């Protein structure tokens, strides 16, 4: 019998902050399971979840507006600790009898708060001391409104000159509110505050660890599928690879992985996937060479969104055909991760805008009538990687830069042709190889090469040539929502350019993309 790793759990109510998923990841890093729900949950849903504690996230709205979100009243009647962050503190204060006002100026950035009263939340935690020995905390503020009166049964724990109630607490009810963001690294002791709340105040044990998550996932897969056969589309990406390894550990030969080689992968990627999963780990893999089929479907198409949809459609067709060849397969496995689940739930409210369609949305035709196995659906990407390491997958593969689902289909601008893909594969391999040699690969968040369908004059030896152009792209980002172009050294860029032009016959010019996000997106298409 495996240990119940969901025994202690934190419920995070999302009021729309850009940092809310980060709060959840921090709680998970503390070894405690948590879930992220929209703020408008019912009392019955909270009771069913049975949380050990509740966190109210930040958010962009103003609590002074009549129709702004509020925490369900049951949150404050459930008898569990509650931690309000920024907007979460403001709605807590307002709902429990305090007062919030719009501030004349938005407070954004570093601040130093002075601890003026003892509280379980910050006891013994400090960055510095005042002249008279009071603790100071370096925090990150990001708010427009502020609490101007706390509820009568709360105390002021910390304040700044411009924010009289930076931390408030009701120790008896174990309600806490902070006007700053403890989840961001700029709040230096933020992780300790979250740990104090989750581990000490809520008394949650650290049961959420990679080894225990694997044991739990394996047990749940076995319980769900029994002796039935399962099929999985293996791409070589992190999510499908870790899904494959978990299923292999759980059901062994009853898993069949279908690897569709669409001709849009990186240099030697198909061989690497087959070697590692087939030869090294002994998984049962069906290799489907489908380059010609994908490229013929893409012929003549220039629109990026149309290309994505074509690649997705052809993949489903090929996968469908292979699945029908297998006898008695009852289950389809997918590498859905927790942010996908959150995103789908958000989209159901109609509030999310589609910037680019996800390649994996849609799934298989209804007539296949398979059950769905999603062993990663509770996990964030960083947790998936840690589990992959625990399962024996190589670090370099798990921590590779992101690669789009449609592959080179959206890194070749305009129409996709085999010639363009072959040139791009080789140029990109040189860029990545040089980044690794210069110890720059892990210093940038994502790096890749883009093929531009324009020719440029070049000189080789005594002759002129009229060949293609590629662009190098490297960015630095924390969350991929915004990004800066990476300031790579000039001599490094020169070395990469020289190698590509000299070694890849057909490319005459290399440029470097210096666009940030926004206004540009990270990928060109």
Curated annotation (Swiss-Prot):
Domain (GMPS ATP-PPase) ranges: 208-400
PROSITE patterns with a match to the protein in the record: GATASE_TYPE_1, GMPS_ATP_PPASE
Enzyme Commission designation: 6.3.5.2
InterPro entries: Class_I_gatase-like, GATASE, GMP_synth_C, GMP_synth_GATase, GMP_synthase, GMPS_ATP_PPase_dom, NAD/GMP_synthase, Rossmann-like_a/b/a_fold
Domain Glutamine amidotransferase type-1 positions: 9-207
GO CC field: cytosol
Swiss-Prot/TrEMBL catalytic activity: XMP + L-glutamine + ATP + H2O = GMP + L-glutamate + AMP + diphosphate + 2 H(+)
UniProt: ATP binding residues: 235-241
Disulfide bonds: none
List of catalytic residues: 86, 181, 183
GO MF annotation list: ATP binding; GMP synthase activity
Organism superkingdom: Bacteria
Signal peptide range: none
Pfam families xref list: GATase, GMP_synt_C, NAD_synthase
Keywords on record: ATP-binding, Glutamine amidotransferase, GMP biosynthesis, Ligase, Nucleotide-binding, Purine biosynthesis
Pathway annotation: Purine metabolism; GMP biosynthesis; GMP from XMP (L-Gln route): step 1/1
Assembly mode: Homodimer.
HAMAP family: GMP_synthase (MF_00344)
Function of the protein: Catalyzes the synthesis of GMP from XMP.
Protein name in UniProt: GMP synthase [glutamine-hydrolyzing]
Organism: Escherichia fergusonii (strain ATCC 35469 / DSM 13698 / CCUG 18766 / IAM 14443 / JCM 21226 / LMG 7866 / NBRC 102419 / NCTC 12128 / CDC 0568-73)
């Amino acid at each position: 019998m495996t240990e119940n790793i969901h025994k202690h759990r934190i419920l995070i109510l999302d009021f729309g902050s850009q940092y809310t998923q980060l709060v959840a990841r921090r709680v998970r890093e503390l070894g405690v399971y948590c879930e992220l729900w929209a703020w408008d949950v019912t009392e019955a849903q909270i009771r069913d979840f049975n949380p050990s504690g509740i966190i109210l996230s930040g958010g962009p709205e103003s609590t002074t507006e009549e129709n702004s979100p509020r925490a369900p009243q049951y949150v404050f009647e459930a008898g569990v600790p509650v931690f309000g962050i920024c907007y979460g503190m403001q709605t807590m204060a307002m709902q429990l009898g305090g007062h919030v006002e719009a501030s004349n100026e938005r407070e954004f950035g570093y601040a130093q708060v002075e601890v003026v009263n003892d509280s379980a939340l910050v006891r013994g935690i400090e960055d510095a001391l005042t002249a008279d020995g009071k603790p100071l905390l370096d925090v990150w503020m990001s708010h427009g409104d502020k609490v101007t009166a706390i509820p009568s049964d709360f105390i002021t724990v910390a304040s700044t000159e411009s924010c009289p109630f930076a931390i408030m607490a009701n120790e008896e009810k174990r309600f806490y509110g902070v006007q700053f963001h403890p989840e961001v690294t700029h709040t230096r002791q933020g992780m300790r505050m979250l740990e104090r709340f989750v581990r000490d105040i809520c008394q949650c044990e650290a049961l959420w660890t990679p080894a225990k998550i694997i044991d739990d996932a394996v047990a749940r897969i076995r319980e769900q599928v029994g002796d039935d056969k399962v099929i999985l589309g293996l791409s070589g990406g992190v999510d499908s690879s870790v899904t494959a390894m978990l299923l292999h550990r759980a059901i062994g030969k009853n898993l069949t992985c279908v690897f569709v080689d669409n001709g849009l992968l990186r240099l030697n990627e198909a061989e690497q996937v087959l070697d590692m999963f087939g030869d090294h780990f002994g998984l049962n893999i069906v290799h489907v060479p489908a380059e010609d089929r994908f490229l013929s479907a893409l012929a003549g198409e220039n629109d990026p969104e149309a290309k994505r949809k074509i690649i997705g459609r052809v993949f489903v067709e090929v996968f469908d055909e292979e699945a029908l060849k297998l006898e008695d397969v009852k289950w389809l496995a997918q590498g859905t991760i927790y942010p996908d689940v959150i995103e789908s739930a958000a989209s159901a409210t109609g509030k999310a805008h589609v910037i680019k369609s996800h390649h994996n949305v849609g799934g298989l035709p209804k007539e296949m009538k398979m059950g769905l196995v999603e062993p990663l659906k509770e996990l964030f990407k960083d947790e998936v990687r840690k589990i992959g390491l625990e399962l024996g997958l190589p670090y370099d593969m798990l921590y590779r830069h992101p690669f789009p689902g449609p592959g080179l289909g959206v890194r070749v601008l305009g129409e996709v042709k085999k010639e363009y893909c072959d040139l791009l594969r080789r140029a990109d391999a040189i860029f990545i190889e040089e980044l690794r040699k210069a110890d720059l690969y892990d210093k940038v968040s994502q790096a890749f090469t883009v093929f531009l369908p324009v020719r440029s004059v070049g000189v080789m030896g005594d002759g002129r040539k009229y060949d293609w152009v590629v662009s190098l792209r490297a960015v630095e980002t924390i969350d991929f929502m915004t990004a800066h172009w990476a300031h790579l050294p000039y001599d490094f860029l020169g070395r990469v350019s020289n190698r590509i032009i000299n070694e890849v016959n057909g490319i005459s010019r290399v440029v470097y993309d210096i666009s940030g996000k926004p206004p540009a997106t990270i990928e060109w298409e």
